[in-house]
Amino acid sequence: MTQIKVPTALIASVHGEGQHLFEPMAARCTCTTIISSSSTF
């Protein structure tokens, strides 16, 4: 699984004003994780 390291400050700003920009990225990450987990079984 690929780990993405993001600065805490960036996370904080994203969680605030830019959350609407980050949500699609988070959803994409979640989907990728689910697909990776599913292919493991």
UniProtKB/Swiss-Prot annotation:
Cross-link Oxazole-4-carboxylic acid (Ser-Ser), where in sequence: S36-S37, S37-S38, S38-S39
Propeptide positions: 1-27
Post-translational modification: Maturation of thiazole and oxazole containing antibiotics involves the enzymatic condensation of a Cys, Ser or Thr with the alpha-carbonyl of the preceding amino acid to form a thioether or ether bond, then dehydration to form a double bond with the alpha-amino nitrogen. Thiazoline or oxazoline ring are dehydrogenated to form thiazole or oxazole rings. 2 forms exist: plantazolicin A and plantazolicin B. The structural difference between them is a dimethylation at Arg-28 in plantazolicin A.
Superkingdom to which the source organism belongs: Bacteria
Presence of the UniProt keyword ATP-binding in the record: no
Crosslink (Thiazole-4-carboxylic acid (Arg-Cys)) position: R28-C29
Cross-link (5-methyloxazole-4-carboxylic acid (Thr-Thr)): T32-T33
Localization: Secreted, Cell wall
GO cellular-component term (any): Gram-positive-bacterium-type cell wall
Function description: Peptide antibiotic inhibiting growth of Gram-positive bacteria in the dimethylated form plantazolicin A. The desmethyl form plantazolicin B has no antibiotic activity. The mode of action appears to be disruption of cell walls and lysis of cells. Inhibits B.subtilis strain HB0042, B.megaterium strain 7A1 and B.anthracis (MIC=2-4 ug/ml). Weakly inhibits Gram-positive bacteria B.brevis strain ATCC 8246, B.subtilis strain 168, B.cereus strain ATCC 14579 and strain CU1065, B.licheniformis strain ATCC 9789, M.luteus, B.sphaericus, P.granivorans and S.pyogenes (MIC=128 ug/ml).
Descriptive protein name: Plantazolicin
Naturally occurring in which organism (per UniProt): Bacillus velezensis (strain DSM 23117 / BGSC 10A6 / LMG 26770 / FZB42) (Bacillus amyloliquefaciens subsp. plantarum)
